[in-house]
Every structure is written in C-alpha cells, then in structure tokens.
C-alpha cells in the first residue's frame, strides 16, 4: 500500500503592532544548521560518499531579509536606541516525517519580535517546511515566517 504525502503545517502569525515603527533589529545569536541528502558511509573505507551538504546560519538569513526591508541590524543592544529596537528570537520547534513514503522530514521554526525597551511581544510566527536538507528546510521556513509577519498591514 502506498502512503499519502504528509501535509506541512500552515504558517501561523500573530502581530500585536507593526514592526515598521522600529528602525533597528538586534538578532539573538543562533548556531549553524547543517544538513545532508543522499549521503552514505561506505563500510569498506569508512568514508562519506555522494550527496549534497548545506549549512545555513538562521541569523544570517534573517539579517539579509530584514535589511532588504529597511531595518538596520545592530551587533549588540544600544541603550540609546532601545525605543526604536526590536529583539528577534529564533527557535526550532521540531521535525516531522512528511512526503511520499515518509522519505522527507520537515523542520518547524518560530520567530518572535519583542520591543527592546518593554519586552512586549510585537509579532511572532511559526512555520514549517521541507527542503532537500535540514538547512534548506530551515531557510524556507524562515522565509515563510517573516513573509507572514511582514505581509500584515502597516497600521
């Protein structure tokens, strides 16, 4: 019997206030995500063969998208700019088997923007995606989450 394709969870988003009233973003540090596909280890020579390996750092990905949207990325929090600064936090929410015969895994992520001065939650989004590697899945999910937040009206 064939197994049906698993569906990705829909992207969810909650926006309390527009992010566009802020000029700066401080991104909490993230580690790199590395993923491989089609890789096998030979029992003969104990070496890794074939496939594609990709690495991404979520902070770098988010920085690029936010700079395109006109934000200035701060290397550290500046006490003189707190009223105009968002703090971005990123986390992974887990992995699920999706796809034909469960040969694919999705990665879920969550992004939160908080006011640097008050710590109030300004916006958050959860997204999930499935790429050819875990690094691709994370990259696609970040794009979906940020798109969901920034597609909200600029009130």
Describe each model-derived feature in a short phrase.
Residues 46, 63-136, 140-143:
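Surface-exposed short loop/turn segments
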């Amino acid at each position: 019997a064939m197994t049906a394709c698993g569906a990705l969870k829909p992207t969810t988003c909650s926006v309390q206030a527009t992010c566009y009233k802020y000029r700066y973003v401080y991104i909490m540090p993230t580690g790199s995500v590395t993923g491989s596909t089609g890789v096998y280890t030979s029992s003969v020579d104990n070496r890794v063969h074939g496939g594609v390996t990709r690495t991404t750092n979520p902070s770098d990905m988010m920085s690029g998208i936010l700079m395109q949207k006109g934000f200035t990325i701060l290397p550290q929090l500046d006490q003189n700019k707190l009223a105009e600064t968002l703090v971005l936090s990123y986390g992974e929410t887990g992995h699920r088997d999706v796809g034909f015969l469960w040969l694919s895994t999705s990665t879920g992520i969550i992004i939160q923007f908080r006011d640097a001065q008050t710590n109030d939650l300004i916006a958050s989004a959860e997204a999930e995606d499935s790429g050819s590697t875990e690094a691709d899945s994370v990259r696609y999910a970040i794009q979906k989450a940020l798109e969901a937040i920034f597609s909200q009206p600029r009130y």
